[in-house]
Amino acid sequence: MASYKKERLENDIIRLINRTVIHEIYNETVKTGHVTHVKLSDDLLHVTVYLDCYNREQIDRVVGAFNQAKGVFSRVLAHNLYLAKAVQIHFVKDKAIDNAMRIESIINSLKKSKPN
């Protein structure tokens, strides 16, 4: 499959999930989360949705709430994406921000310990 088609589908999935959170989900915990990026498998059967939220302490609750509403998201994706089979959605915590903060703290500690 062409990579541009897969990239277009990933962008459509982000758009559909965000629209569903705004218009169809009434759980406030879900509304605090947002999709950072999406990874679609090569066979178009599995999609990994990376989530983040403003309050980092609640990220596990947000991922759990998204998993509870997985049926709504599956229905929306099945109706709006023209694929042979419905995709299986996997919601996971986006660790990119945590990793960036950890690297920044290491760099700052190295700068402080380095004599000038």
UniProtKB/Swiss-Prot annotation:
GO terms for cellular component: cytosol. It is found in: Cytoplasm. It comes from the Bacteria. GO terms for biological process: maturation of SSU-rRNA. The keyword Translocase does not apply. GO terms for molecular function: ribosomal small subunit binding. Keywords: Cytoplasm, Ribosome biogenesis. InterPro entries: KH_dom-like_a/b, RbfA, RbfA_dom_sf, Ribosome-bd_factorA_CS. Pfam families: RBFA. One of several proteins that assist in the late maturation steps of the functional core of the 30S ribosomal subunit. Associates with free 30S ribosomal subunits (but not with 30S subunits that are part of 70S ribosomes or polysomes). Required for efficient processing of 16S rRNA. May interact with the 5'-terminal helix region of 16S rRNA. Monomer. Binds 30S ribosomal subunits, but not 50S ribosomal subunits or 70S ribosomes. PANTHER family: RIBOSOME-BINDING FACTOR A, CHLOROPLASTIC-RELATED. NCBIfam families: rbfA. Belongs to the RbfA family. This is Ribosome-binding factor A. The lineage of its organism: Bacteria, Bacillati, Mycoplasmatota, Mycoplasmoidales, Mycoplasmoidaceae. The gene is rbfA.
